[in-house]
């Protein structure tokens, strides 16, 4: 066992213990909630072909009128919504699904413009597509 490495490791951990490191890490979620099935965000996939970027976002239980999509910058897309329960709370026996506000900012790998976004909500999936801004360089034989 290398006691010198252990001593250095302890020094490093003590530095973080004295700072606000763990407070900042746990700022948004308490340790006992790290593995909760409830989440106030959603998951998405990103695809590309030669001409378009495609984003598929899981939005179960979100109606179009409760959905907000906004381009914060050319590479940041804000998606907000509300997941509404199907039945009233007094009928609830067991609940595993999350209900309430959801929000996520998606970092886009390629720039987008608002007027080029095509958006459709279908069967609990939000489909977003926009054209790629790929530059083509002409080959000059004379060089």
Curated annotation (Swiss-Prot):
Molecular-function GO term, any one: unfolded protein binding
Record's keyword terms, sorted: Sporulation
Xref: PROSITE patterns: SHSP (PS01031)
Induction entry: Induced late during sporulation by the sporulation-specific sigma factor sigma-K and negatively regulated by GerE.
Residues in the signal sequence: none
Record's keyword annotation contains Nucleus: no
InterPro entries to which the protein is assigned, alphabetical: A-crystallin/Hsp20_dom, HSP20-like_chaperone
Residue ranges occupied by any sHSP domain in the UniProt entry: 34-143
KW Metal-binding (keyword) present: no
Domain of life according to the entry: Bacteria
UniProt similarity note: Belongs to the small heat shock protein (HSP20) family.
Name of the protein: Spore coat protein P
């Amino acid at each position: 066992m290398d006691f010198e490495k252990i001593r250095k490791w302890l020094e490093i951990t003590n530095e973080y213990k004295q700072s606000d490191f763990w407070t900042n890490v746990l700022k948004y979620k308490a340790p006992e909630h790290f593995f909760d099935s409830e989440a106030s965000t959603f998951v998405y996939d990103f695809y590309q072909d030669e001409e378009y970027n495609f984003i598929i976002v899981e939005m179960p239980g979100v109606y179009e009128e409760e959905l907000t999509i906004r381009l914060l910058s050319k590479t940041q897309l804000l998606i907000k919504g509300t997941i509404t329960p199907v039945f009233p709370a007094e009928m609830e026996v067991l609940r595993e699904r999350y209900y309430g506000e959801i929000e996520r900012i998606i970092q886009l790998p390629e720039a987008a413009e608002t007027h080029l976004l095509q958006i459709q909500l279908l069967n609990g999936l939000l489909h977003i597509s926009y054209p790629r801004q790929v530059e083509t360089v002409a080959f000059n034989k004379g060089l």
